[in-house]
């Protein structure tokens, strides 16, 4: 440390000595080697400022005061620098110690935190182990408890079985009496029922019988009444009227007194329901009739005999006078009109579902005192009745082991009703709603057909649409679907506009605006460029860059310069002075033009060369009359003859024109410029060409637009294509030009 201090002091002394020498030289004082050493000795002796001035005045002279002031100022700066350096080093040392203390504290804190976490983890593991041990103890307790309960349950069951065994060995006198009485009643009253049932299972025929006539009332020996629970039948198409019909039937049940929760019935036996199996059923039914009857009978309780009720009942009766077979009188609520409106005569479904629905109504069974003469009749009520006369066939023998029966092939006759009840009104409302659905559906179809726009020509060909005038069979529709359809149809009718469903030929330059009766397209065509409607499309096609000069026959783009017509439309040329220079239109009768336009519209794709036959004939006639080129006088005469013949030709050609060959006429492109212009050498080219130059072969303008006939060139015969294209050209024969 001392060595470093001494080294630093010597360096400071050297620097100070050099600074003193430089300052003296700056002041202009003569400096030798001893003067800086003398000043350094004075500094080391720490002489005061005044003493130093007195001692140096001899050597420095006038600059003594200035030099001494500079020297002491330098001492002050060095002193301040050394003090600051010491303070800085002290601060750094303090900061370093503080950082070391902070690091030690953090390390200690981290160590304590890790120890705490490890301790918490250990406690958590211990808790988990304790919980697992507790669960194990609980499982053992539950197993023991379950075992005790199982033993107790088994003991109770054993005691019950012992009591049941002891009870089953004895019968009370009352039970014996009831059983004996029931067996006697079965043998006495239901012997013929079993025979009739087995016979009915083989063959059943159904016929219509008239309404039962009124007769003195007779008591019924037994009556079975079942609580009505109306369910929809198996037909899934009757959902539309299901809710209203169900509500009406339930209200009728409550008003009749048997729709409540009370049940009234009398003593019964399984054979009392023998006639139930005589109801028609589907042979493909999967449920056994005996099983279903057993299930129904199990729900009937024994009560005292109630009075006979008139409303909505299914009565099973035996009529001895009808041939010995069982008969069923089914009373249906509602009149002829309600059933008629719902078209029940077309939609009667006889299946297991309907049979169950009928059986769940009030059932009244009548059994006579003897097997042959028991007859029960009902008084007339205000409701209609449907009577099924189920009689066995005479050619079949009754057997007890007949397991099947044939399908019900009966008919239904509806009697008139003189009065109407609330149930009838509900049925009429239901039927009216159902009828209104069919009428609304048919009317909506007719309205939709009437509103179809006359755009059948847009589809590339007229397709016939055959609408059936026959009334459709009634198929009920849910009210939600019906209302949605009616809303859609009503919305479509409200949006009907007054525009004709055809595009305006002046669009987009039409000046009428919204008052125009034709359609102005507003949206782009989605099928472009595959749209097949062409100029009849009601949507926007992009404009063609060639516009009215377009030569493509079925160009899908829009051409505003053709007045709404497709380029290459039906246009007939006029006098055939020269096919390459003709620019005038032929004047023909208006019926011919109308028929031609109609024929062209009907043809989806016009023939390529159908109308060129007549032009070829004209060309052949004109060329035939031209002689070989000679003197100018001969040319003038030939031209005059040619003009006269051509003036006569249109008159001769227009007269015999008939609409018969119209389907073969193709549109001419006389308003479309030929791409070769005056250089075209096709004598039957049907595009528009410039007029013939008046200078002819003598024209000296190399860029002349007009047509120049080749000088000295004989006309080239083109009879082969002309004859192939038109049968009328066969009468012309080509001859040499020099033969004339």
Swiss-Prot record:
Residues 82-240, 254-314, 390-426, 444-469, 623-661 are annotated as: Disordered. Gene3D superfamilies: 4.10.1000.30, 4.10.1000.40, Nuclear abundant poly(A) RNA-bind protein 2, N-terminal domain. Residues 186-200 have a biased composition (Basic residues). Residues 414-426 have a biased composition (Acidic residues). GO terms for molecular function: poly(A) binding; zinc ion binding. A zinc finger (C3H1-type) spans 499-522, 523-543, 668-691, 674-691, 693-709. Its main location: nucleus. InterPro entries: Nab2/ZC3H14 (IPR040366), Nab2/ZC3H14_N_sf (IPR043094), Znf_CCCH (IPR000571). Pfam families: zf-CCCH_2 (PF14608). Residues 204-214, 393-409 have a biased composition (Polar residues). GO terms for cellular component: cytoplasm; nuclear speck; nucleus; perinuclear region of cytoplasm. Keywords: Cytoplasm, Metal-binding, Nucleus, Repeat, Zinc, Zinc-finger. One of its GO terms (biological process) is regulation of mRNA stability. The keyword Transmembrane does not apply. Residues 87-158, 176-185, 632-652 have a biased composition (Basic and acidic residues). RNA-binding protein involved in the biogenesis of circular RNAs (circRNAs), which are produced by back-splicing circularization of pre-mRNAs. Belongs to the ZC3H14 family. This is Zinc finger CCCH domain-containing protein 14. It comes from Caenorhabditis elegans.
């Amino acid at each position: 440390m001392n060595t470093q201090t001494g080294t630093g002091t010597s360096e400071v002394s050297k620097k100070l000595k050099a600074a003193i020498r430089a300052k003296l030289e700056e002041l202009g004082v003569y400096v030798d080697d001893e003067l800086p050493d003398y000043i350094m000795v004075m500094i080391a002796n720490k002489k005061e400022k005044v003493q130093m001035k007195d001692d140096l005045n001899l050597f420095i002279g006038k600059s003594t005061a200035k030099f001494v002031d500079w020297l002491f100022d330098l001492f002050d700066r060095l002193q301040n620098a050394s003090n600051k350096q010491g303070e800085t080093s002290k601060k750094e040392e303090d900061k370093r110690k503080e950082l070391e203390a902070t690091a030690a504290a953090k390390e200690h804190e981290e160590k304590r935190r890790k120890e705490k976490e490890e301790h918490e983890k250990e406690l958590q593991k211990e808790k988990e182990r304790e919980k697992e041990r507790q669960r194990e103890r609980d499982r053992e307790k539950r197993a023991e408890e379950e075992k005790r309960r199982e033993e107790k349950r088994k003991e109770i069951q054993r005691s019950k079985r012992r009591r049941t065994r002891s009870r089953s060995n004895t019968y009370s006198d009352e039970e014996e009496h009831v059983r004996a009485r029931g067996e006697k009643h079965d043998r006495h009253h239901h012997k013929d029922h079993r025979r009739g049932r087995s016979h009915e299972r083989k063959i059943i025929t159904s016929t219509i019988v008239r309404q039962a006539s009124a007769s003195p009332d007779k008591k019924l020996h037994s009556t079975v009444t079942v609580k009505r629970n109306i369910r929809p039948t198996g037909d899934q198409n009757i959902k539309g009227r299901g809710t209203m019909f169900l509500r009406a039937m339930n209200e009728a049940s409550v008003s009749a007194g048997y729709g409540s929760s009370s049940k009234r019935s009398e003593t019964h036996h399984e054979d009392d329901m023998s006639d139930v199996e005589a109801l028609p059923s589907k042979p493909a039914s999967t449920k056994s009739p005996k099983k279903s009857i057993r299930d129904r009978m199990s729900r009937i309780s024994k009560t005292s005999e109630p009075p006979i009720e008139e409303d909505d009942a299914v009565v099973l009766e035996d009529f001895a006078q009808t041939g010995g077979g069982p008969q069923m009188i089914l009373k249906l609520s509602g009149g002829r009109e309600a059933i008629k409106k719902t078209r029940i005569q077309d939609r009667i479904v006889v299946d297991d579902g309907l049979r169950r629905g009928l059986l769940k109504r009030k059932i009244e069974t009548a059994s006579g005192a003897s097997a042959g003469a028991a007859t029960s009749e009902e008084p007339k009520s205000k409701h209609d009745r449907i009577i099924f006369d189920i009689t066995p066939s005479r050619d079949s023998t009754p057997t007890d082991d007949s397991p099947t029966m044939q399908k019900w092939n009966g008919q239904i006759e509806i009697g008139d009703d003189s009065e109407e009840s609330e149930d009838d009104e509900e049925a009429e409302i239901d039927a009216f709603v159902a009828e209104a659905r069919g009428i609304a559906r048919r009317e909506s179809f007719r309205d939709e057909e009437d509103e179809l726009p006359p755009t059948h020509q847009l589809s590339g060909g007229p397709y016939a649409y055959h609408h059936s005038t026959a009334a459709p069979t009634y198929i009920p529709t849910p009210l939600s679907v019906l209302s949605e359809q009616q809303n859609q149809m009503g919305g479509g009718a409200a949006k009907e506009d007054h525009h004709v469903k055809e595009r305006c030929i002046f669009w987009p330059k039409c000046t009428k605006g919204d008052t125009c009766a034709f359609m102005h397209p507003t949206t782009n065509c989605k099928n472009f460029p595959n749209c097949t409607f062409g100029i009849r499309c009601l949507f926007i096609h992009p404009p063609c860059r060639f516009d009215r000069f377009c030569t493509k026959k079925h160009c899908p783009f829009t051409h505003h310069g053709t007045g709404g017509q497709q380029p290459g439309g039906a246009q007939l040329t006029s006098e055939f002075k020269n096919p390459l220079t003709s620019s005038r239109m032929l004047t023909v009768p208006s019926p011919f033009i109308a028929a031609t336009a109609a024929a062209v519209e009907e043809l989806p794709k016009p023939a390529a060369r159908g109308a060129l036959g007549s032009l070829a004939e004209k060309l052949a006639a004109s060329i035939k009359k031209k002689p070989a080129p000679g003197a100018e006088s001969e040319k003038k005469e030939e031209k005059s003859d040619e003009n006269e013949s051509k003036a006569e030709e249109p008159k001769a050609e227009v007269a015999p024109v008939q609409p018969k060959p119209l389907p073969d006429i193709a549109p001419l492109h006389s308003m479309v410029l030929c791409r070769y212009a005056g250089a075209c050498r096709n004598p039957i080219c049907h595009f528009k060409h410039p007029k013939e130059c008046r200078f002819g072969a003598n024209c000296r303008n190399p860029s002349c637009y007009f047509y120049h006939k080749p000088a000295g060139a004989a006309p080239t015969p083109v009879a082969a294509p002309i004859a192939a294209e038109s049968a009328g050209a066969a009468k012309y024969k080509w001859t040499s030009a020099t033969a004339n």
